[in-house]
Amino acid sequence: MARPVPIEKLRNIGIVAHIDAGKTTTTERILFYTGKTYKIGEVHEGAATMDWMEQEKERGITITSATTAAYWKGYQLNIIDTPGHVDFGVEVVRSMKALDGIVFVFSSVEAVQPQSEANWRWADKFGVPRIAFVNKMDRTGADFFKVYDDIIEKLGAKPVPIQVPIGSEENFEGIVDLFEMKAYIWRGDELGAKYDVTDDIPSDVLPVAEEWREKMIEAIVETDEELMEKYLEGEELSVEDLKKALRKATISRELVPMLCGSAFKNKGVQPLLDAVIDFLPSPVDVPPVKGVNPDTGEEEERHASDNEPFCALAFKVMADPYAGQLTYFRVYSGVIKAGDTILIANKNKKVRVGRILRMHANQREEITEVHAGDIAAAVGLDTVTGDTLSDPNHPIVLESMEFPEPVIAMAIEPKTKSDQEKLSQVLNKFMKEDPTFKVTVDPETNQTLIHGMGELHLEIMVDRMKREYGIEVNVGKPQVAYKETIKKKAVGEGKFIRQSGGRGQYGHAIIEIEPLAEKDYEFVDKIVGGVIPKEFIPAVDAGIQEAMQSGVVAGYPMIGVKATLFDGSFHEVDSSEIAFKIAGSMAFREAAKKANPVLLEPIMLVEVDTPEEYMGDVMGDLSKRRGKILGSEKKGTTMTIKAEVPLAEMFGYATDLRSLTQGRATFSMVFEKYEEVPKNIADEIAGAKAKAES
């Protein structure tokens, strides 16, 4: 089976935005104009093609990143639609690994919002080129140039408008293409499929277009010496040369082309598709992926070529009600065929590939092979998100994905005892699908706790248990995922001796612990002269890690600790792994109590949009919640207030904000950092936890 298109004509793109910026609507229009759907699905009607889970249709938000292939002017676009809601940010992170370029959708009214900032930082981290699409130009308060300023100020990027709008709010008619200096005007009612292209630019828009064309040319020539010389010598620059230079500068992430439109009103989407082709990279335009050969330990590269050994990344795993487990994978090099045996390289496990599907939201087309650069889904592979798939004869392990830690937990139990086993199978399935969803058992109360990125995240998981698997559960109140850490160095000694007839137990370890900023835990072995035999040292490490699961302040997991084992002793006959594990735990607990232990809590970055008259009340309320106000700014008719607030104080905030502002304010929050809890509150938390467990 040949490639559908040459690799140079392939674009793997993500569509990313803050919730409600109109991202799913934009994706729907793209699918309509590329001929993938015959009827436009509106989000507010619950009919959007990409939002295929029941809960998405009800809530009008995108939860899982559906992927679909579409075709435009001889190019294949693999589009990944990602959620804008903060609780599902993990979907954005994992799809970044599969992408070569991103369309960032911004609302022309709200401009750059918190989740967009968070996603932009992730795109920086993964080095993904992007273009900006300013949507909702038909809305009251629409301001294309305000978004331009915001992108510079908040994202530290260099946007380059390649269009300017013709009109705005209810008078928004179309755009001026600054390369060709032509007006694109959408008038008819053919769902935006037809539009006029004319040299006749409205007289009130012409001076604005001329000014911004000059700015566009200046920004582009600054990235290209040859063009700069021509420009300074007064030579006319061809559109082709300018576009070529902008493509290069977009791929190198020096510039961000900026476009505008109204997806809902069917205006501006076709030029956006042209820009995806013109400026975003194909798989051969991005650097090769790097990984480690597990046999040699050497770093190796894989280029986007069918002739190199097969290498792919499983970037998403989902349970499918009809096909079983689906593994979405991005092929970086080589070719994979249905029936091939491949290696899950990070687990050194061979598996046979059965059926391969090309996905369109939740519909599928069976294909026989996938080539370098392409994205597809395999049925029934035993993988988890982040696994590397490779040619068994040329193994390579790609860098694994990092995901944010869950910040909220909730106790659950099945309503009927008979569902207990089924529930644990389903929870395991969910953990495979979603790396930010975790399940633990509280050692004190024996309760099952589910952990996630926010209340909505956990609500949807509970809803899925009932809908997809018929399991009804009782849920407890949401709890904050507190952590503990230490603030100074301390030494601890653990000696475990048991004599009870026959063989005894003997383990003795002395450790020093100290604060560690850059990671959660590090173990250093400084034993000399064999005072503890080598085979028992991992047991001390395991004992320390076990003790860290239940800290000394209030029994929460400890983070940010470096532990150095430097002394101890052993007994020729009685020493054992279990004795040293217990000694390690004892030594850690003794040291931790002396190391100025403190409680940490998740701090959220909260952004509230409120009419001006409620501003004082909203700020006062945030301060009462131990919030630190970072600032406020006027956006159209509303004020935007930014604050850092402990998550513990934000439960039920949506209801309180509604009553405070008569339902006129909205808010969003993103996890920011862990911070020390004030002593008086830490004492209350520790007391409440001890009481609950007694």
Curated annotation (Swiss-Prot):
Keyword Nucleotide-binding in record: yes
SUPFAM superfamilies on file: EF-G C-terminal domain-like (SSF54980), P-loop containing nucleoside triphosphate hydrolases (SSF52540), Ribosomal protein S5 domain 2-like (SSF54211), Translation proteins (SSF50447)
Keywords: Cytoplasm, Elongation factor, GTP-binding, Nucleotide-binding, Protein biosynthesis
Main location: cytoplasm
Pfam families to which the protein is assigned, alphabetical: EFG_C, EFG_III, EFG_IV, GTP_EFTU, GTP_EFTU_D2
GO terms for biological process, alphabetical: ribosome disassembly
Any single GO CC term annotated in Swiss-Prot or TrEMBL for this entry: cytoplasm
Molecular function terms from GO: GTP binding; GTPase activity; translation elongation factor activity
Intracellular or extracellular location(s): Cytoplasm
Family annotation (SMART domains): EFG_C, EFG_IV
Segments forming domain tr-type G: 8-284
UniProt: GTP binding residues: 17-24, 81-85, 135-138
Similarity section: Belongs to the TRAFAC class translation factor GTPase superfamily. Classic translation factor GTPase family. EF-G/EF-2 subfamily.
NCBIfam families assigned to the protein according to its UniProt record, in alphabetical order: EF-G (TIGR00484), PRK12740.1-5 (NF009381), PRK13351.1-1 (NF009891), small_GTP (TIGR00231)
Function field: Catalyzes the GTP-dependent ribosomal translocation step during translation elongation. During this step, the ribosome changes from the pre-translocational (PRE) to the post-translocational (POST) state as the newly formed A-site-bound peptidyl-tRNA and P-site-bound deacylated tRNA move to the P and E sites, respectively. Catalyzes the coordinated movement of the two tRNA molecules, the mRNA and conformational changes in the ribosome.
Protein name: Elongation factor G
Organism name: Persephonella marina (strain DSM 14350 / EX-H1)
